[in-house]
Amino acid sequence: VKVEVDTSIRLVPEATGKLLAWASGLEGSTNTYLEQTKALAQKLGAYYRPDGLTEIGFWVPGLIRDVLHEREIYLEVFTPQEPIDWQAKEQSIKFKRDRLHLEQQGEYIWGVVSGMRAGNREQAGSFYWLRYVDQAERLRTIRDLLPISLPYGIFAPAELYDIDRLQANRTDLDYLERTAKSGNSKRKPPRVGDPKNVLEIHVGTASPEGTIAGLTRIYQEISTKIEQGQPLTPTEQNYVGYDAIELLPMEPTIEYRDEYSPESEFFAFTTGEDSRENDNDIVEIELFKPNTQDWGYDVPILGSSTTNPALLSSLRPDEVVDFIATLHNFPTYPIQLIYDLVYGHADNQSELLIAREFMKGPNMYGQDLNHQLPMVRAILLEMQRRKINTIGDEQYCSGDSRA
Protein backbone atom coordinates (compact mmCIF):
# COMPACT_ATOMS: atom_id res chain seq x y z
CA VAL A 1 0.00 0.00 0.00
CA LYS A 2 1.45 3.34 -1.03
CA VAL A 3 0.55 6.42 1.01
CA GLU A 4 0.40 9.65 -0.96
CA VAL A 5 1.56 12.72 0.96
CA ASP A 6 -0.07 16.14 0.82
CA THR A 7 2.47 18.96 1.15
CA SER A 8 0.26 21.87 2.30
CA ILE A 9 1.77 21.49 5.75
CA ARG A 10 5.51 21.05 5.31
CA LEU A 11 8.50 19.70 7.14
CA VAL A 12 11.15 22.40 7.61
CA PRO A 13 14.45 20.61 6.83
CA GLU A 14 16.90 23.00 8.48
CA ALA A 15 14.96 23.31 11.74
CA THR A 16 14.30 19.56 11.78
CA GLY A 17 18.01 18.92 11.28
CA LYS A 18 18.83 21.04 14.33
CA LEU A 19 16.31 19.10 16.41
CA LEU A 20 17.79 15.78 15.27
CA ALA A 21 21.32 16.98 16.01
CA TRP A 22 20.29 18.03 19.50
CA ALA A 23 18.67 14.65 20.17
CA SER A 24 21.61 12.63 18.85
CA GLY A 25 24.02 14.84 20.81
CA LEU A 26 22.48 13.67 24.07
CA GLU A 27 23.87 10.17 23.51
CA GLY A 28 27.44 11.47 23.60
CA SER A 29 26.89 13.63 26.66
CA THR A 30 28.03 12.89 30.21
CA ASN A 31 24.44 12.87 31.45
CA THR A 32 23.02 9.69 32.94
CA TYR A 33 20.61 7.68 30.82
CA LEU A 34 17.67 8.89 32.92
CA GLU A 35 18.81 12.50 32.48
CA GLN A 36 18.99 11.94 28.72
CA THR A 37 15.50 10.46 28.60
CA LYS A 38 14.12 13.32 30.71
CA ALA A 39 15.56 15.80 28.21
CA LEU A 40 14.04 13.86 25.31
CA ALA A 41 10.68 13.63 27.08
CA GLN A 42 10.53 17.43 27.31
CA LYS A 43 10.54 17.52 23.49
CA LEU A 44 7.77 14.95 23.04
CA GLY A 45 4.34 16.06 21.90
CA ALA A 46 3.71 19.20 19.87
CA TYR A 47 4.98 22.66 20.78
CA TYR A 48 3.91 25.76 18.84
CA ARG A 49 7.01 27.95 18.79
CA PRO A 50 7.11 31.77 18.88
CA ASP A 51 8.36 31.75 15.26
CA GLY A 52 5.16 30.01 14.11
CA LEU A 53 6.74 26.61 13.54
CA THR A 54 5.67 23.48 15.39
CA GLU A 55 8.08 21.01 17.00
CA ILE A 56 6.77 17.46 17.08
CA GLY A 57 8.17 14.36 18.76
CA PHE A 58 6.88 10.83 19.32
CA TRP A 59 8.39 7.91 21.24
CA VAL A 60 7.64 4.83 19.12
CA PRO A 61 9.35 1.76 20.65
CA GLY A 62 8.83 -1.37 18.60
CA LEU A 63 7.05 0.49 15.81
CA ILE A 64 9.48 -0.26 12.99
CA ARG A 65 9.10 -4.03 13.39
CA ASP A 66 5.32 -3.60 12.99
CA VAL A 67 5.54 -1.57 9.78
CA LEU A 68 5.98 -3.11 6.36
CA HIS A 69 7.85 -0.12 4.90
CA GLU A 70 9.45 2.71 6.89
CA ARG A 71 8.01 5.45 4.67
CA GLU A 72 4.48 4.37 5.49
CA ILE A 73 4.73 6.13 8.88
CA TYR A 74 3.33 9.64 8.55
CA LEU A 75 1.91 12.57 10.49
CA GLU A 76 -1.76 13.17 9.78
CA VAL A 77 -3.10 16.65 10.48
CA PHE A 78 -6.74 17.80 10.50
CA THR A 79 -7.39 21.54 10.35
CA PRO A 80 -11.01 22.72 10.81
CA GLN A 81 -12.39 24.59 7.82
CA GLU A 82 -15.22 26.14 9.83
CA PRO A 83 -15.65 27.27 13.45
CA ILE A 84 -16.22 24.59 16.08
CA ASP A 85 -18.99 25.27 18.59
CA TRP A 86 -17.38 24.11 21.84
CA GLN A 87 -20.76 23.98 23.60
CA ALA A 88 -22.51 21.82 21.00
CA LYS A 89 -23.25 18.26 22.03
CA GLU A 90 -22.99 17.11 18.43
CA GLN A 91 -21.88 18.78 15.20
CA SER A 92 -20.49 17.92 11.80
CA ILE A 93 -17.32 19.78 10.77
CA LYS A 94 -15.24 19.73 7.60
CA PHE A 95 -11.48 19.36 8.12
CA LYS A 96 -8.62 19.72 5.70
CA ARG A 97 -6.39 16.68 5.98
CA ASP A 98 -2.63 16.92 5.43
CA ARG A 99 -0.11 14.11 5.55
CA LEU A 100 3.66 14.35 5.74
CA HIS A 101 6.61 12.20 6.68
CA LEU A 102 8.71 13.14 9.68
CA GLU A 103 12.23 11.93 10.50
CA GLN A 104 12.89 8.72 12.39
CA GLN A 105 15.84 8.53 14.82
CA GLY A 106 16.00 5.24 16.70
CA GLU A 107 12.90 4.92 18.88
CA TYR A 108 11.82 8.49 18.16
CA ILE A 109 10.14 10.36 15.34
CA TRP A 110 10.90 14.08 15.10
CA GLY A 111 9.96 17.02 12.94
CA VAL A 112 9.65 20.79 12.79
CA VAL A 113 6.63 21.68 10.70
CA SER A 114 5.24 24.84 9.11
CA GLY A 115 1.59 25.54 8.38
CA MET A 116 -0.11 24.00 11.42
CA ARG A 117 -2.65 26.21 13.17
CA ALA A 118 -2.34 26.67 16.93
CA GLY A 119 -5.49 26.67 19.00
CA ASN A 120 -6.37 29.26 21.62
CA ARG A 121 -9.39 30.36 23.63
CA GLU A 122 -11.12 31.68 20.51
CA GLN A 123 -10.18 29.23 17.76
CA ALA A 124 -9.55 25.55 17.21
CA GLY A 125 -6.07 24.44 16.31
CA SER A 126 -4.96 21.67 13.99
CA PHE A 127 -5.54 18.15 15.26
CA TYR A 128 -2.77 15.58 14.78
CA TRP A 129 -1.60 11.99 15.28
CA LEU A 130 0.80 9.53 13.69
CA ARG A 131 -0.52 6.92 11.28
CA TYR A 132 1.09 3.86 9.77
CA VAL A 133 0.18 0.78 7.77
CA ASP A 134 1.11 -2.44 9.55
CA GLN A 135 2.30 -5.68 7.99
CA ALA A 136 -1.29 -6.86 7.60
CA GLU A 137 -1.99 -3.62 5.68
CA ARG A 138 -4.21 -2.27 8.45
CA LEU A 139 -4.25 1.45 9.21
CA ARG A 140 -2.93 2.07 12.73
CA THR A 141 -2.72 5.16 14.96
CA ILE A 142 -0.17 6.49 17.44
CA ARG A 143 -1.49 9.29 19.65
CA ASP A 144 0.38 12.05 21.47
CA LEU A 145 1.09 10.89 25.02
CA LEU A 146 1.61 14.42 26.35
CA PRO A 147 -0.91 16.74 24.67
CA ILE A 148 -1.80 20.21 25.86
CA SER A 149 -5.35 19.93 24.55
CA LEU A 150 -7.45 16.80 24.02
CA PRO A 151 -10.95 18.22 23.45
CA TYR A 152 -12.50 15.07 22.01
CA GLY A 153 -11.09 12.45 24.30
CA ILE A 154 -8.32 9.90 24.48
CA PHE A 155 -9.13 8.11 21.21
CA ALA A 156 -9.26 11.31 19.14
CA PRO A 157 -6.27 13.22 17.77
CA ALA A 158 -4.72 15.86 20.02
CA GLU A 159 -5.07 19.58 19.29
CA LEU A 160 -2.06 21.82 18.74
CA TYR A 161 -2.35 24.62 21.31
CA ASP A 162 -0.52 27.90 21.88
CA ILE A 163 0.58 27.29 25.47
CA ASP A 164 2.84 30.38 25.52
CA ARG A 165 -0.11 32.64 24.69
CA LEU A 166 -2.24 30.96 27.36
CA GLN A 167 0.42 31.54 30.03
CA ALA A 168 1.10 35.14 28.95
CA ASN A 169 -2.59 36.12 29.17
CA ARG A 170 -3.43 34.63 32.57
CA THR A 171 -4.77 37.05 35.18
CA ASP A 172 -2.68 35.89 38.16
CA LEU A 173 0.74 36.94 36.86
CA ASP A 174 1.27 39.24 39.86
CA TYR A 175 0.75 36.29 42.23
CA LEU A 176 3.16 34.16 40.21
CA GLU A 177 5.78 36.90 40.26
CA ARG A 178 5.49 37.24 44.04
CA THR A 179 5.72 33.52 44.75
CA ALA A 180 8.63 33.11 42.33
CA LYS A 181 10.78 35.11 44.75
CA SER A 182 12.21 33.22 47.68
CA GLY A 183 13.75 34.66 50.82
CA ASN A 184 15.84 31.49 51.09
CA SER A 185 18.48 31.45 48.37
CA LYS A 186 19.10 27.74 48.96
CA ARG A 187 15.55 26.78 47.98
CA LYS A 188 15.35 26.41 44.23
CA PRO A 189 12.76 26.55 42.89
CA PRO A 190 10.96 28.69 45.49
CA ARG A 191 8.18 27.01 47.44
CA VAL A 192 4.87 28.34 48.67
CA GLY A 193 4.00 27.66 52.30
CA ASP A 194 2.39 24.39 53.29
CA PRO A 195 -1.41 24.60 53.62
CA LYS A 196 -2.88 23.96 57.06
CA ASN A 197 -6.37 22.98 55.94
CA VAL A 198 -7.44 21.61 52.57
CA LEU A 199 -10.83 21.26 50.90
CA GLU A 200 -11.08 18.20 48.63
CA ILE A 201 -13.40 18.71 45.68
CA HIS A 202 -14.81 16.36 43.05
CA VAL A 203 -15.29 18.63 40.05
CA GLY A 204 -18.13 16.66 38.51
CA THR A 205 -20.41 17.06 41.54
CA ALA A 206 -19.23 20.34 43.11
CA SER A 207 -21.33 22.65 40.92
CA PRO A 208 -24.58 22.37 38.96
CA GLU A 209 -22.55 22.49 35.74
CA GLY A 210 -20.21 19.72 36.83
CA THR A 211 -17.26 21.49 35.20
CA ILE A 212 -14.23 23.61 36.05
CA ALA A 213 -16.11 26.63 34.72
CA GLY A 214 -18.87 25.90 37.22
CA LEU A 215 -16.35 26.00 40.08
CA THR A 216 -14.87 29.22 38.72
CA ARG A 217 -18.32 30.81 38.66
CA ILE A 218 -18.94 29.83 42.29
CA TYR A 219 -15.63 31.27 43.52
CA GLN A 220 -16.01 34.43 41.45
CA GLU A 221 -19.48 35.02 42.91
CA ILE A 222 -18.11 34.45 46.43
CA SER A 223 -15.23 36.85 45.70
CA THR A 224 -17.65 39.55 44.57
CA LYS A 225 -19.75 39.17 47.72
CA ILE A 226 -16.68 39.37 49.98
CA GLU A 227 -15.42 42.49 48.20
CA GLN A 228 -18.84 44.13 48.55
CA GLY A 229 -19.30 43.07 52.19
CA GLN A 230 -22.32 40.89 51.44
CA PRO A 231 -23.10 37.79 53.53
CA LEU A 232 -22.47 34.36 52.03
CA THR A 233 -25.19 31.75 51.83
CA PRO A 234 -24.78 28.56 53.90
CA THR A 235 -23.88 26.71 50.70
CA GLU A 236 -21.23 29.27 49.75
CA GLN A 237 -19.69 29.07 53.21
CA ASN A 238 -18.75 25.45 52.48
CA TYR A 239 -16.26 26.65 49.83
CA VAL A 240 -14.27 29.13 51.94
CA GLY A 241 -11.96 29.15 54.94
CA TYR A 242 -9.35 26.84 53.42
CA ASP A 243 -5.71 27.46 52.51
CA ALA A 244 -5.86 25.09 49.55
CA ILE A 245 -8.18 23.10 47.35
CA GLU A 246 -7.33 19.56 46.27
CA LEU A 247 -9.13 18.44 43.15
CA LEU A 248 -9.76 14.74 42.70
CA PRO A 249 -7.99 13.52 39.52
CA MET A 250 -8.87 15.56 36.46
CA GLU A 251 -6.80 13.62 33.93
CA PRO A 252 -8.58 12.20 30.88
CA THR A 253 -10.41 9.07 31.97
CA ILE A 254 -11.37 5.91 30.16
CA GLU A 255 -14.35 6.02 27.82
CA TYR A 256 -17.32 3.71 28.16
CA ARG A 257 -17.67 2.12 24.76
CA ASP A 258 -19.90 -0.30 22.87
CA GLU A 259 -16.91 -2.22 21.49
CA TYR A 260 -13.33 -2.89 22.56
CA SER A 261 -11.96 -0.80 19.72
CA PRO A 262 -9.29 1.89 19.24
CA GLU A 263 -11.66 4.04 17.16
CA SER A 264 -12.93 7.33 18.59
CA GLU A 265 -16.62 7.70 19.35
CA PHE A 266 -16.33 11.46 19.91
CA PHE A 267 -14.29 12.22 16.75
CA ALA A 268 -16.04 10.06 14.16
CA PHE A 269 -15.23 10.10 10.46
CA THR A 270 -18.28 10.23 8.22
CA THR A 271 -16.17 10.30 5.05
CA GLY A 272 -12.67 9.43 4.04
CA GLU A 273 -10.94 7.95 7.10
CA ASP A 274 -9.53 4.98 5.23
CA SER A 275 -8.69 6.94 2.08
CA ARG A 276 -4.93 6.83 1.57
CA GLU A 277 -4.90 8.82 -1.63
CA ASN A 278 -4.15 12.48 -2.17
CA ASP A 279 -7.30 13.42 -4.08
CA ASN A 280 -9.62 13.63 -1.07
CA ASP A 281 -8.09 16.14 1.31
CA ILE A 282 -11.39 17.32 2.85
CA VAL A 283 -12.97 14.98 5.36
CA GLU A 284 -16.18 15.38 7.31
CA ILE A 285 -16.04 14.47 10.98
CA GLU A 286 -18.87 14.14 13.46
CA LEU A 287 -17.85 15.70 16.78
CA PHE A 288 -19.55 14.66 20.03
CA LYS A 289 -18.87 16.53 23.25
CA PRO A 290 -17.24 14.08 25.71
CA ASN A 291 -19.37 13.21 28.72
CA THR A 292 -17.42 10.49 30.58
CA GLN A 293 -16.97 11.39 34.24
CA ASP A 294 -16.12 9.27 37.26
CA TRP A 295 -14.03 9.64 40.42
CA GLY A 296 -10.96 10.14 38.24
CA TYR A 297 -8.88 7.08 39.05
CA ASP A 298 -9.68 5.01 35.93
CA VAL A 299 -6.92 6.55 33.85
CA PRO A 300 -5.38 5.38 30.56
CA ILE A 301 -2.21 7.47 31.30
CA LEU A 302 -2.32 8.92 27.79
CA GLY A 303 -3.11 12.62 28.10
CA SER A 304 -2.29 12.88 31.81
CA SER A 305 -0.56 16.17 31.00
CA THR A 306 -3.95 17.75 30.31
CA THR A 307 -7.56 17.71 31.58
CA ASN A 308 -10.51 15.40 31.03
CA PRO A 309 -12.56 17.28 28.40
CA ALA A 310 -15.79 16.17 30.09
CA LEU A 311 -14.82 18.52 32.95
CA LEU A 312 -14.33 21.48 30.60
CA SER A 313 -17.45 23.39 29.63
CA SER A 314 -15.47 25.19 26.93
CA LEU A 315 -13.21 22.24 25.97
CA ARG A 316 -10.34 24.76 26.22
CA PRO A 317 -7.28 24.48 28.52
CA ASP A 318 -7.82 28.14 29.45
CA GLU A 319 -10.73 27.06 31.63
CA VAL A 320 -8.37 25.42 34.13
CA VAL A 321 -6.05 28.44 34.22
CA ASP A 322 -9.05 30.75 34.75
CA PHE A 323 -10.02 28.71 37.82
CA ILE A 324 -6.48 28.72 39.20
CA ALA A 325 -6.22 32.49 38.68
CA THR A 326 -9.54 33.00 40.48
CA LEU A 327 -8.14 31.11 43.48
CA HIS A 328 -4.81 32.93 43.43
CA ASN A 329 -6.62 36.30 43.27
CA PHE A 330 -9.14 35.46 46.01
CA PRO A 331 -9.82 38.66 48.02
CA THR A 332 -9.05 37.37 51.53
CA TYR A 333 -5.81 35.55 50.66
CA PRO A 334 -4.56 33.39 47.78
CA ILE A 335 -5.93 29.87 47.77
CA GLN A 336 -3.48 27.19 46.64
CA LEU A 337 -4.42 24.38 44.28
CA ILE A 338 -3.33 20.76 44.73
CA TYR A 339 -3.54 18.22 41.93
CA ASP A 340 -4.22 14.56 42.68
CA LEU A 341 -2.14 12.70 40.07
CA VAL A 342 -2.48 9.00 39.31
CA TYR A 343 0.72 7.40 38.03
CA GLY A 344 0.61 4.10 39.92
CA HIS A 345 -1.50 2.13 37.46
CA ALA A 346 -3.35 2.30 34.16
CA ASP A 347 -6.77 0.98 33.21
CA ASN A 348 -6.81 -1.97 30.80
CA GLN A 349 -8.11 0.39 28.12
CA SER A 350 -4.59 1.83 27.99
CA GLU A 351 -3.53 -1.26 26.03
CA LEU A 352 -5.41 0.21 23.06
CA LEU A 353 -3.63 3.55 23.36
CA ILE A 354 -0.02 3.37 24.52
CA ALA A 355 3.04 1.26 23.78
CA ARG A 356 3.24 -2.11 25.52
CA GLU A 357 6.63 -1.03 26.91
CA PHE A 358 4.67 1.21 29.30
CA MET A 359 3.10 -1.76 31.05
CA LYS A 360 4.69 -4.29 33.38
CA GLY A 361 1.73 -6.63 33.84
CA PRO A 362 -1.81 -6.85 35.21
CA ASN A 363 -2.87 -5.83 38.70
CA MET A 364 -6.17 -5.46 40.55
CA TYR A 365 -6.82 -2.05 38.95
CA GLY A 366 -5.74 -2.86 35.40
CA GLN A 367 -2.06 -2.63 34.49
CA ASP A 368 1.08 -1.91 36.48
CA LEU A 369 3.26 0.75 34.88
CA ASN A 370 6.87 -0.04 34.09
CA HIS A 371 8.44 2.65 36.28
CA GLN A 372 11.81 0.92 36.06
CA LEU A 373 12.11 1.74 32.35
CA PRO A 374 13.87 5.14 32.16
CA MET A 375 11.77 6.47 29.26
CA VAL A 376 8.51 5.57 30.99
CA ARG A 377 9.68 7.26 34.17
CA ALA A 378 10.85 10.30 32.20
CA ILE A 379 7.49 10.63 30.43
CA LEU A 380 5.56 10.40 33.71
CA LEU A 381 7.80 13.10 35.20
CA GLU A 382 7.25 15.24 32.11
CA MET A 383 3.48 14.78 32.39
CA GLN A 384 3.75 15.99 35.97
CA ARG A 385 5.91 18.97 34.97
CA ARG A 386 3.47 20.10 32.30
CA LYS A 387 0.53 19.68 34.66
CA ILE A 388 2.21 21.68 37.43
CA ASN A 389 3.14 24.39 34.92
CA THR A 390 -0.52 25.39 34.95
CA ILE A 391 0.42 26.40 38.54
CA GLY A 392 -1.19 23.87 40.78
CA ASP A 393 0.83 24.95 43.81
CA GLU A 394 1.34 21.36 44.94
CA GLN A 395 0.70 17.86 43.70
CA TYR A 396 -0.35 14.62 45.35
CA CYS A 397 0.50 11.35 43.61
CA SER A 398 -1.69 8.31 44.15
CA GLY A 399 0.30 5.09 44.27
CA ASP A 400 -2.78 2.95 43.71
CA SER A 401 -6.43 3.66 42.95
CA ARG A 402 -6.66 5.81 46.07
CA ALA A 403 -3.75 6.25 48.46
Briefly describe each language-model feature range:
Residues 234-243, 248-403:
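Substrate-binding/active-site clefts of carbohydrate-active enzymes
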Residues 85-104:
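Solvent-exposed serine/threonine-rich low-complexity stretches and specific carbohydrate-binding patches
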Residues 58, 64-89, 132:
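Extended low-complexity, serine/threonine- and proline-enriched intrinsically disordered segments
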Residues 60-62, 79, 117, 134, ...:
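Short, flexible loop/turn elements at secondary-structure junctions
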Residues 91-94, 193, 292, 300:
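Acidic/polar, low-complexity linker and loop regions
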Residues 1-67, 94, 104, 108-110, ...:
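The feature marks proteins involved in alpha-glucan
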Residues 211-237, 376-385:
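Short, acidic/polar
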Residues 80-89, 161-180, 379-382, 403:
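Extended charged low-complexity segments that act as oligomerization/scaffolding linkers
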